[in-house]
Amino acid sequence: MSIQHFQTKLGITKYSIVTNSNDSVTLRLMTEHDLAMLYEWLNRSHIVEWWGGEEARPTLADVQEQYLPSVLAQESVTPYIAMLNGEPIGYAQSYVALGSGDGWWEEETDPGVRGIDQLLANASQLGKGLGTKLVRALVELLFNDPEVTKIQTDPSPSNLRAIRCYEKAGFERQGTVTTPDGPAVYMVQTRQAFERTRSVA
């Protein structure tokens, strides 16, 4: 496995993970050419349920407006496409929690904290461990940056599948928080916990 990195226009180091294992979920940076595919994914029923709800179904123009700045490295959100055996199977993103705006993580003071979100594109692939593999790949990628101290996420309390997925990937529940999207289970994985688990393995 290798991890490639580069500097963006904002001076933020972004990473892309590459592996030769055929059964691994890998991540590549999303490009402008992926936006139409992401638009189609974001309108699939199993994704709509947890990604904004029916009233937030996006148009292609919505997706282009929201995600193109990230693709062009004009903001601190890094978008990825998850791959399995050369085929795209999902989307993931990481972002700097500090100063993320719009009411998110307003009390955060540590610039090393990263937030994550992800989805699997195909309902037929749910419950097969791919989500856990995706999250683990994303966690490893992010902790390759020595400045990252903690990774956090915020699934809905009703999204039991996501909560189990995060727990299998090494996240711990830290209680319930109120976010702009409503109540959420606050889950974290610290660098210390990640390195401890990796040393045992």
Curated annotation (Swiss-Prot):
Organism: Klebsiella pneumoniae
Name of protein: Aminoglycoside N(6')-acetyltransferase type 1
Functional note: Catalyzes the transfer of an acetyl group from acetyl-CoA to the 6'-amino group of aminoglycoside molecules conferring resistance to antibiotics containing the purpurosamine ring including amikacin.
Leader peptide range in chain numbering: none
Binding site for acetyl-CoA: 159
Entries under CDD domains matching the protein: NAT_SF
One Pfam family from the record: Acetyltransf_8
Superkingdom assignment: Bacteria
Database matches in PROSITE patterns: GNAT (PS51186)
Gene3D superfamilies membership: 3.40.630.30
Start and end residues of each N-acetyltransferase domain: 25-192
GO molecular function: aminoglycoside 6'-N-acetyltransferase activity
Residues reported to bind substrate: 51, 154
Keywords from the UniProt entry: Acyltransferase, Antibiotic resistance, Plasmid, Transferase, Transposable element
Catalytic activity: kanamycin B + acetyl-CoA = N(6')-acetylkanamycin B + CoA + H(+)
BP term (GO), one: response to antibiotic
InterPro entries: Acyl_CoA_acyltransferase (IPR016181), GNAT_dom (IPR000182), N6_acetyl_AAC6 (IPR030971)
Enzyme class: transferase
Known partners and oligomeric status: Homodimer.
The protein's Enzyme Commission number: 2.3.1.82
